[in-house]
């Protein structure tokens, strides 16, 4: 009965925790409503034609990571980008979406704002006069906010050396003869900014959300709105209704931050349920990626590019079906268009722009002005199904570039985004991590409590893996020193401070699983839950399993020396080696804590340093505990084996 009662209590706690998290995230009432989005009126004209009007283009660059210690080529290539690339493409504006500097220490573990990195960045902007050529909108990323106690701190070099030089979200309007286009910056950087890795997620509090809601309302009269920020929406903590809801009237959200997951996901694009595109651009740091985007007769197109690769080609009409959305743009203009339209740029003059549809040669596009090339077509010839358009551009130096995409002149056709990319960008990872963390903890506690209050085991069936595992859990749970050690470790991982130290240089604080207290502020937990999951999965639970296995060996009548002489090395040694590797991982986590947060954090870290020191003591106690403590278990096991 006690075991059933304990199970019900734990299950009830788990259900309550899940419901609380869902209510906190989605809310029930009293939250600001997202902007209303009435059905857009039909606007077939002006349709894309032979002229050079109703079009402008811009660039996005992200995660530059200028470093005083690593890869000086980042700065060299950025200077070339700000001179050569900008001069050739001549964008109306450039969005530099965060992590302008690296802000790491020499060994790449710690974090510190280096003024010389910011001076290098500003020096490039001034030397190339890029701010005289285009509107350069640079915003902060999490690296630009590392180790900054407040926005007014002298360490906040963004205020001194950037082009924008102002903290917080803002609204920039690009005015043209054919309408206004809004660009809204989302500043989700953490204030105060802790050292790495505890500011990987961005945070928008209620005040920031209200500011963004006002900016969204300001942009309602613009032809189009693009939101841009450093963090993906999946790595931003925001109260209900959530950042995605507030930006739902925008055609796209342009961001960086994830570095294409180290190259594992070179294309991180998706569409949210409200219709807004989310487009993460690859990093400049290692991959020298950037993006060109354009509005052509209010149809949005873009292409992700590699620096130094020419020609640069963007098909603006017909636009890609994958990135089309009738709720946000006048797709009917495609059906009424008279010309295929292409933007083509290169170091040398463009000599030919060849167009093919479904593999059929359609002709050579004619140069209109600047980078604009057009070719007359009849879209009604392609009124059914989907079609593939290919454009091949050559310049006078012999360079060639071929681009293609699928299009449709029917508005009811759709293509699906990569499911993994959609999962990465559309999932609130801090909520998933929080739920998973709670479930792991509750599962471990449930097992401990059930075996604690169940009766002594009766081994009736053959001693297979499951029976012996159950038996060892009984042993662990019914010997007080081991039961309370594991119980305390699990509860402490959830509730106790992991370490105390300088969260920011000169500012002391405590780190918990649910967040960080520093300098009078509370930073809500996000990456802390992921670190907590790693701690549970790679040390706490394996330690519990290793103790169970060792206690089982004791019940067989062995001590540490005798169990090594069983001549079962292939079964015994892998267990010890695996635990040794996990212990080394725990030791490394102590070193990482020392390198990132200093000596004080290293010394006052119960979950890292203290646990690392106490683990050998606990394991030694397992192997040296008086055999009389195992009396009833040894008798029962030997009786079962003999029978």
Swiss-Prot record:
Subcellular localization(s) per the UniProt record: Membrane
Gene Ontology CC: membrane
Claim: Transmembrane is one of the keywords in the record: yes
Gene3D superfamilies, per database record: 3.60.21.10
Protein name: Transmembrane protein 62
Membrane topology: Multi-pass membrane protein
Highest taxon of source: Eukaryota
Transmembrane segments annotated in the record for this chain: 3-23, 431-451, 481-501, 527-547, 572-592, 599-619
Keyword Methyltransferase among UniProt keywords: no
Glycosylation (residues): 180, 467, 626
Species the sequence originates in: Homo sapiens
């Amino acid at each position: 009965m006690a075991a059933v009662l304990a199970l019900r209590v734990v299950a009830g706690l788990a259900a309550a925790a899940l419901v609380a998290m869902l209510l906190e995230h989605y809310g029930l009432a009293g939250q600001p409503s997202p902007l209303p989005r009435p059905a857009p009126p039909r606007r077939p004209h002006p349709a894309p034609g032979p002229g050079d009007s109703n079009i402008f283009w811009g660039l996005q660059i992200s995660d530059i990571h200028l470093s005083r210690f690593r890869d000086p080529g980042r700065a060299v290539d950025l200077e070339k980008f700000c001179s050569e690339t900008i001069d050739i493409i001549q964008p109306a504006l450039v969005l530099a979406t965060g992590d302008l500097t690296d802000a790491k220490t020499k060994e790449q573990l710690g974090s510190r704002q280096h003024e010389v990195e910011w001076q290098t960045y500003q020096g490039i902007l001034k030397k190339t006069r890029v701010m005289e050529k285009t509107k350069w909108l640079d915003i902060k990323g999490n690296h630009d906010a590392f180790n900054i106690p407040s926005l007014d701190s002298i360490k906040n070099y963004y205020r001194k050396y950037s082009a924008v030089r102002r903290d917080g979200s803002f609204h920039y309007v690009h005015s043209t003869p054919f309408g206004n286009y809004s660009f809204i910056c989302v500043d989700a950087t953490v204030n105060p900014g802790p050292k790495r890795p505890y500011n990987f997620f961005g945070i928008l509090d209620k005040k920031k959300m209200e500011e963004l809601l006002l900016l969204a309302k300001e942009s309602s009269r613009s032809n189009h709105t693009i939101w841009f920020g450093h963090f993906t929406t999946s790595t931003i903590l925001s109260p209900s209704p959530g950042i995605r809801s507030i930006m739902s009237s925008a055609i796209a959200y342009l961001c960086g931050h994830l570095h294409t997951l180290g190259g594992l996901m070179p294309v991180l694009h998706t569409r949210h349920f409200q219709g807004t595109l989310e487009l993460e651009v690859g990093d400049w740091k290692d991959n020298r990626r950037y993006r060109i985007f354009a509005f052509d007769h209010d149809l949005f197109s873009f292409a992700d590019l590699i620096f130094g690769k020419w020609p640069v080609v963007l098909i603006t009409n017909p636009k890609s079906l994958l990135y089309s959305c009738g709720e946000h743009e006048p797709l009917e203009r495609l059906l009424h268009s008279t010309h295929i339209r292409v933007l083509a740029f290169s170091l040398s003059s463009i000599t030919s722009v060849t167009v093919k549809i479904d593999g059929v040669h359609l002709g050579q596009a004619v140069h209109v002005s600047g980078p604009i090339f057009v070719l007359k077509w009849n879209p009604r010839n392609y009124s059914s199904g989907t079609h593939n358009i290919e454009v091949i551009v050559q310049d006078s130096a012999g360079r060639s570039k071929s681009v293609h995409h699928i299009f449709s002149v029917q508005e009811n056709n759709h293509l699906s985004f990569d499911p993994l990319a959609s999962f990465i960008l559309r999932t609130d990872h801090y909520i998933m991590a929080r739920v998973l963390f709670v479930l792991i903890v509750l599962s471990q506690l449930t097992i401990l409590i059930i075996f604690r209050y169940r009766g002594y085991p009766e081994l009736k069936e053959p001693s297979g893996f499951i029976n012996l595992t159950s038996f060892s859990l009984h042993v662990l749970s019914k010997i007080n020193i081991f039961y309370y050690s594991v119980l305390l470790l699990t509860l402490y991982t959830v509730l106790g401070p992991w370490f105390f130290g300088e969260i920011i240089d000169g500012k002391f604080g405590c780190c918990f699983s649910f967040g960080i207290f520093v300098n009078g502020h509370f930073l809500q937990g996000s990456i802390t839950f992921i670190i907590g999951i790693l701690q549970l999965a790679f040390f706490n639970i394996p330690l519990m399993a290793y103790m169970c296995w060792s206690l089982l060996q004791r019940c067989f009548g062995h001590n540490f020396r005798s169990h090594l002489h069983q001549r079962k090395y292939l079964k015994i040694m892998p267990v010890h080696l695996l635990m040794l590797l996990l212990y080394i991982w725990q030791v490394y986590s102590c070193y990482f804590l020392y390198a990132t947060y200093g000596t004080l954090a290293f010394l006052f870290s119960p979950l890292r340093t203290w646990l690392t020191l106490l683990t050998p003591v606990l394991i030694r106690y397992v192997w040296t505990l008086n055999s009389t403590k195992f009396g009833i278990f040894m008798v029962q096991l030997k009786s079962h084996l003999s029978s």
